[in-house]
Each structure stands twice: as structure tokens, then as C-alpha cells.
């Protein structure tokens, strides 16, 4: 099948009302980019059956001008009365629904195990087990509602998944992505790759790296960049694997240790492979570093615990920070960060530790120590503790994310240098 025009559609009145952010679309686009597909358009729709139906009809009519269209849609497959995706697709195709036996079994098991009134609960929840008749069923390994793949026209395929991010990501990787690669296998192969560049802005990256790359200027490769908290994600795509690899090598050479893979995936693998244990001592980030680690399944194998030493009494009482250190240098200082990291090593009995202490704002700053100042300690058992100073003059929530991501990067960097 020919290379498709890809459109990502998200449904949910919470999205169109601005109450929630559409993180699904960006995640899907990133995954598709890595598979060699480029999304041409994002569409966000409210929970309105008429609007959903008309938009799907409009997108289907694009097939008269495009050789092939792939629609990837999320949301509207749940048990409530405002979940209209299934209804809209069935009306557009003029078909009825059919039951997914796997989903039916999962929902029966789900309610029986929880001791609920089974028959009463099923009256509402049973809506989730149906798909348009004749569809390819996408099994849901995390939740209940299945997704489905169906044809809206001869050259228009629609893949629908639940809007819950955890369910959607697993369904995409396990079910939809393999189908996409198989269905469009006759297309020209595209290759992609990416790096995180730490403490870098999009404009600076374009000026000092992208603008000097002839292959990009000549259109032999396309590039993209997304700003994150503490880093940018720079990506490349080309029909030449050698060219993508060459661009990544140039990135690594130009930016050195600031150029990394996805450390949020790589670091857990390193810790598991090397059987390294870690812990945290956090002040200004309030446990966000610990949360980031423990968001990963299986993290208990290497993450022993975290101490949120927000008050100085916790710094002294649990981490063993000296009272004299706090009096002379203050809670936000190199000296305190060092003693926090070393105290975490002892208190938690781990191989490595991360400490962080800073001024998140909006108050608390002084002419000598401004809001945004933050110190990190990277402790290693029986080795010298490393101290790093950074300055993130951003709103409180952004500051905390910058600091948390930076602390994780600093641990990754030390482990790489210690290898």
C-alpha cells in the first residue's frame, strides 16, 4: 500500500474546553516519526456525536485527493454516555456493532474480583466491549475497552484507541504499530533517530548546529526539535540510515556529554544491568525525582527510597546535615547539598544518591541567592561527592521539573563516567 497521509484525531470535551492537555497526539506523532511516518495534521474534537461524524466524513473525503490516508484516533471508547466514537464510526460505515470476546471476559473478571454488584455494573460498563462489525480488534492489555481498525473507504484506514494514556500507549505499541508497519511495508523505508541535548534552547540549537548541516539544507534529511524541561529532543529522519547515524554522531561530537539517548529509559536499564542501588534527598523538588524513578515498573530493584527534607529539622535529624553548615552557608548551598547526598547514602544504604536544594520561588530569594538557584549533590559510596550549581529562573512548577530532570541527568552522567 502507498505511503499514507497521516492524521491524528483526539476526542474529548475536556480537551476542547482547555481543562486537559492533549498529550496523546504528541506521543503518537513521536512514535510514528520513529517508525518512518510523518503526521500531517492534528485534529481535536469535543464529545459531540454530530461533530465527530462530520469530521470523520470530511477526512474520509480527502481520499479523493490522496492516494492513501491513515487516521489514528483516541478517546470516546469508554462506558459513559459522552463516549461517541463507536457510534459515529458505525453511522459513517452503516454497520452495527459486534462484541469482543476478550474484552467481555476481562470486564466480567474485573467486576467479579472487586466484589461489586455484577449485573448492575455491567449494564453501563458493557458498552466498552463492542467494536464496529468487521473490524480488526485491538486488544487492551491494561484496561477494558478494545480498540479497532476499520476501513472508511478503499484507501482510508482508521485506527481507534482509548483516550487513557496508559491504555493507549500499550495498545499502540502492542497492537496498532505492528499493523501499521505490516500494512504499509511496501512504502519507501525511512529511518529516524534522536538525542536529548541538555540545557539547550530550540533557537540556539538551530543556529549552532542545524544551520550548518548541508544534508538538511539540501532536503536529504528532515529534522525536528521539541523543548522539554531541562533539555530539547532533537530528531532526524531520512531514507538513508547512514545519514541519520552520521547526524547523530555529529551531535554527540559537537555537544559531548550533553548529548544523550533517552535517559529516562536508559538509566533504569543501566541500574538493573550493573545492579546499582540509588536513593534521593530532595528539598525544593518535593519528591519529584523519586516519583520519576518510581513511575517505571520494576524500579524497586534499584530505587531504595527518598527523603523529602523540606524543613531543616529533617536535614539535620534524618540526613545528618550539621547545624553549623546550615547556620554558616544556608540550606541552599554547596555544603548543604554535599552533606544531604552523603547523608542519603548512609540513611538509605545505597550505592549512589542524588540531593537537591534550591529556591523554587516566588519568594525566598536574596541578592546573593536569587530565586531559581539550585545545588545538586551526586553521592557515590566510598567516593568523593560531586556538587553542581544551576540556575533555573522559571515559575515554580517549571523550576521543579527542570531541577528534577537535571538531577537525574547528573546521576546518569556520573554513571557513564564511572563505567
From Swiss-Prot:
Pfam families recorded: CinA (PF02464), MoCF_biosynth (PF00994)
Disulfide topology: none
Gene3D superfamilies per record: CinA-like (3.90.950.20), MoaB/Mog-like domain (3.40.980.10)
NCBIfam families: PncC_domain
Family: Belongs to the CinA family.
Name by which UniProt lists this protein: CinA-like protein
Lineage: Bacteria, Pseudomonadati, Spirochaetota, Spirochaetia, Leptospirales
